[in-house]
């Protein structure tokens, strides 16, 4: 008997923690279980061949919002070449409408609904021990029995600490993100999120968590990403883990947490302030700053408190902050979203994620679609097309804003240029709004561009902005360019450095400046030294020193 666990991830760097948990929990049947991971970017024929050559008796596949269509197409063909195999689905994308899924996908024997560890273990036992009566008494499944579809109900939640640690051999996770779960469920009721359905919040034993994190620390894993929905919802749990990783820091490993910033306490902030730059990074969901929207989505957030805490963390200078907004929420029209964007942008996060509402199966938001006039895509990821407050024209405009934010803000490559531009626009949202429109008007939106071409397009756009000094813009761009790297070829818009060649050479020789460092003379006479051997651990920007006095003294002597 061979049972194949299949995961189809969005990217190669991702790994599927869920299927590894299933495999580990069903270790009694380890000799019969094989795990295979693929990506949705692979050719289906290649995956189909690989699965076929395993000659499985049972195929269990995890289904998510990013892979469902891919999985259904793949399994529909696999059943033709593996007619004797049983196919099972599991995961959030099939748990909430299991009967409908089985009616529409006749190749599947059944669906594991909800938490899968105990269910999969029993299911594996059913096949290995060849006991046909097991399915009738097994909770956590919906299955096909002849012409009938039988739903046995959801299983009671399990003890999270009973799941074995899956990371025994890190070689199979090389160059991939390590995911870790220290809690399951969520105490909040955000209407767009499936985590809000699972109110039974539970935690992995803290001492067990420490031992497992030490394994990552000892092995100098580059990054560990916690999948906990609100990591800091229980103060003692979060504080113990943050304190532990701070005290056992190896100087390499980064830990990623999704948190609610307004829940942070002084003790936690004090601990964060002492951390190595880059030890942790925080993802903070703001979603909207419109009070009516926050109330409608059943979200709990004190934005003024959140703002103060984000500012405070920013002042530490050691923690990457990633803030999220969602377009398409109830009561959020275009102008309201502009306001939310400006509010969050002012907090200066390292990343500002502009996402769009996805109407998930089983969520309260799906139940409210008619009342809110929400229209969304038929196929996953079920993304919003329009609402009572936001028409499709404005959704399209926000899509271009999202793209511009990703290219110009989140890349971190235009930071000083963007800050300089703020005073020439009514608000920061207008920068990205107008730049996005410019891209579309010029036909630049559907073309891939080099980093340097992005600078040139920005310059072209700014030529029609009143009162702006193009010379100063160009200097800001040159500054941003050299912050990241010592350019092999200077852009055409950069200031000519030939008049200063001898003075810069003398300065470099006198001060024994490293060969890979760069010295730049700007239009206002400022001379800056970019040291690439000394980089900011958060931004990776070169350390910059003002050497104007040293170079100009040399100029004056000459």
What are these regions (language model features)?
Residues 2, 18, 25-156:
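Glycine-rich beta-alpha loop elements in corrinoid/cobalamin-binding modules
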Residues 161-315, 319:
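Radical SAM [4Fe-4S] cluster-binding motif and immediate context
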